[in-house]
Every structure is written in structure tokens, then in C-alpha cells.
């Protein structure tokens, strides 16, 4: 009986390692540029804001519309986004844990992936920069 318990434990350990590797490999898959291409809303908020309070105060000073292009360049209101980041973003690329923006002066800004279709980071000022799909754009 002890040898069958050891065999079962060994089989279970092997199965757990295999499942863990598969799950990790899936989590590291990069999104294709075509999957993310389109209009995105960049929103600047304080850590205390929630979706409801943010919706009530959306105004040009805390929101700008940018376009992630398939060729991994940016369009739209990149100057607005650049004011918050300190360097106007001109290129972008996906990473396993989010999205990076590259500025005109080669600065790199990393936005971590959050639930669903939005990315975010906390700026040095403590404000939160969130990049989310433009709600008025139809889903791909």
C-alpha cells in the first residue's frame, strides 16, 4: 500500500507541475497589436476616485483620446498624454504584464494590465493614469 500512495503522490505532483506550466504559459501570451488597435481613453484620476465620481467629473483636463495603431505607433491626443507622462508617447508595445509606451525622447512608461480591457499605472504625483477602450467605439 505505501508504494501505491507514493506512486499516486508522484503522479499528482507531476500533474500539478504540468498544469501550472500550462497556466503560466497562457498568462505570458502577448496580445497581438491588431487585438489592441483602436481608440483608447486615457483618464487621470486620484486614488480616491471611483468609476461613478470619475464619470461625473470627466472633462478635457483629465481625459484624452489616443489611438493605438496596428503598426504600433500612437495617434490622437498624444500631446495631452505627454503632459502627464513628461514625454509625448509615439510608439507602444505589449508585454506579458501590460503595455508600454515609448516617448519621443525614448522614455518608457509601463502600464500594468488590470481586469478586462484597461491598463493603469500610478504617476510620481500619486495620480492614477488609466488607459481603457473608448466606450463609444464598437467592440472588435
UniProtKB/Swiss-Prot annotation:
It comes from Pseudomonas brassicacearum (strain NFM421). The keyword Transcription does not apply. Inhibitor of the alkaline protease. Belongs to the protease inhibitor I38 family. Residues 1-25 form the signal peptide. Its main location: periplasm. GO terms for cellular component: periplasmic space. InterPro entries: Inh/Omp19, Protease_inh_b-brl_dom. This is Alkaline proteinase inhibitor. The gene is inh. GO terms for molecular function: endopeptidase inhibitor activity. SUPFAM superfamilies: beta-Barrel protease inhibitors. It is found in: Periplasm. Keywords: Metalloenzyme inhibitor, Metalloprotease inhibitor, Periplasm, Protease inhibitor, Signal. Pfam families: Inh. It comes from the Bacteria.
Amino acid at each position: 500500500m505505501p508504494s501505491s500512495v507514493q506512486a499516486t503522490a508522484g503522479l499528482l505532483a507531476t500533474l500539478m507541475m504540468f498544469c501550472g506550466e500550462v497556466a503560466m504559459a497562457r498568462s505570458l501570451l502577448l496580445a497581438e497589436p491588431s487585438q489592441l488597435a483602436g481608440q483608447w481613453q486615457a483618464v487621470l484620476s486620484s486614488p480616491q476616485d471611483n468609476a461613478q465620481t470619475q464619470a461625473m467629473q470627466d472633462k478635457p483636463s483629465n481625459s484624452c483620446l489616443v489611438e493605438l495603431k496596428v503598426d504600433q505607433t500612437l495617434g490622437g491626443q498624444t500631446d495631452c498624454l505627454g503632459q502627464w507622462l513628461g514625454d509625448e508617447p509615439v510608439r507602444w508595445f505589449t508585454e506579458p504584464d501590460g503595455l508600454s509606451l515609448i516617448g519621443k525622447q525614448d522614455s518608457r512608461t509601463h502600464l500594468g494590465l488590470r481586469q478586462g480591457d484597461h491598463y493603469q499605472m500610478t504617476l510620481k504625483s500619486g495620480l492614477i493614469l488609466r488607459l481603457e477602450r473608448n466606450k463609444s467605439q464598437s467592440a472588435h
